[in-house]
């Protein structure tokens, strides 16, 4: 099994592109935007359902393993769909995906992904490259994009506070790409794959786009036991945050 160090951004991009060509009857490949360092952000749609659920990973370069796993999951789902297999003798994948398709975006922040793998010299823009080097952060611990911004906390919410020059809500290309695709597609749900304890702050609007709602999404990757042990402390934290609600209304952002 390849590790994240063996999986290049280009390999991830082309694996999704090739999957769409091979399984063209029920998949669609799309570039939803470009990063500040001019890398394309790919998305693979699986299934033919009218409703969709977004599966997103790679907000931070340090979440490279989640990017790799989500890519593998997408390819495996394509194979299962084509063969019309039933998973665990319970889940009819083809039937489910023909009702609700998956929109998989495994690498939202391709610049950060490449920086963690190859170092700051992989940044093409010389100004961005020099600014990042001046921050004196080890490349394998770097969590931002090519401009040094945290894309997971760049969405227009009450949590988005300006900490750097030129930083405003939705100031980053990666953030705007997600907002556009969420607004275009709507959606029935959002799954964010990220490292333990990390949070992605995103916004949500009703279909008429008049009233904003804000939700805190996090994918902690805990075991069920650990989740139960931490339930009390988690509840205390959520009292000060917007409530997490599962609704059938379209989700229009992450």
Regions found by a protein language model. Name each.
Residues 1-10, 15, 19, 23, ...:
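C-terminal accessory segments enriched in acidic
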Residues 26-34, 140:
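Short acidic, Pro/Gly- and aromatic-enriched capping/linker segments at domain boundaries
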Residues 42-50:
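Short beta-strand-to-loop junctions in surface cap/lid or active-site-entrance loops
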Residues 50, 64-66, 70-211:
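Active-site/substrate-binding loop(s) of hydrolase catalytic cores
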Residues 52-55:
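Conserved beta-strand elements of the Class I
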Residues 59-63:
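A generic structural motif
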């Amino acid at each position: 099994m390849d590790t994240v160090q063996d999986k290049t951004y280009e390999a991830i991009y082309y694996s999704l592109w090739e999957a769409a060509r091979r399984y063209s009857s029920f998949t669609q490949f799309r570039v939803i935007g470009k990063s500040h360092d001019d890398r394309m952000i790919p998305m693979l749609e699986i299934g033919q359902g009218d409703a969709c659920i977004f599966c997103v990973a790679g907000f931070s370069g340090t979440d490279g393993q989640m990017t790799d796993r989500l890519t593998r999951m997408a390819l495996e789902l394509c194979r299962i769909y084509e063969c019309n297999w039933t998973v665990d003798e319970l889940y009819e994948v083809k039937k489910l995906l023909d009702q609700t398709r998956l929109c998989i975006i495994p690498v939202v922040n391709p610049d950060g992904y490449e920086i963690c793998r190859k170092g700051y010299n992989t940044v093409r823009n010389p100004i961005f490259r020099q600014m990042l080097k001046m921050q004196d952060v080890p490349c394998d611990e770097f969590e931002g994009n090519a401009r040094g911004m945290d894309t997971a906390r760049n969405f227009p919410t009450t949590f988005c506070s300006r900490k750097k020059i030129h930083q405003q809500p939705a100031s980053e290309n990666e953030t705007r790409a997600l907002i556009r695709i969420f607004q275009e597609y709507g959606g029935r749900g959002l799954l964010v794959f990220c490292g333990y304890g990390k949070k992605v702050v995103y916004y949500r609007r009703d279909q008429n786009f008049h009233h904003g709602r804000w939700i805190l999404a996090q994918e902690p990757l805990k075991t069920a036991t650990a989740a139960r042990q931490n339930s009390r402390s988690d509840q205390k934290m959520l009292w000060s945050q917007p409530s997490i609600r599962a609704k059938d209304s379209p989700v229009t952002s992450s």
